[in-house]
Amino acid sequence: MAEYTISQQKIKIGTTSDKVANDALQVQISWIIFNGDASFRRVQPRNPVTFESLNAAGAIQLVTRYSELNLDAKAFTHGLFNPDRSVSRAQDFGVGINWYLNHNIKLQLSYNQTHFTHGAVARFDRPTEKILFSRMQVAF
């Protein structure tokens, strides 16, 4: 699955205003590697965990994502944002594993790295952010 968007906004800070156009994209690829059927609605485990079958396996999915945000250079050159405190580009790459216990419960574990470029003090980039996070999703 992939998305691309362009956002145009008129920004006014104090007496300074300008119209800026930012763009962003996201690409995600996922694979059901064990015991499930994929669809655009929800993953359906072939052997779901229920109260009657607590030793069932559920379904396992691997996911990889890439996303990017590009801010309009006019926002910095016309004084709307401070180039010494902000970056104009962020790129994120992530991998994850999802465990679908059944139709209603999903456990997620993901790792992401975000690289920031084109900005910050004296044009030095901010350090890369790294995050490991987990989530439990209940859908009904």
Residue ranges of predicted features:
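Outer-membrane beta-barrel pore domains
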Residues: 1-140
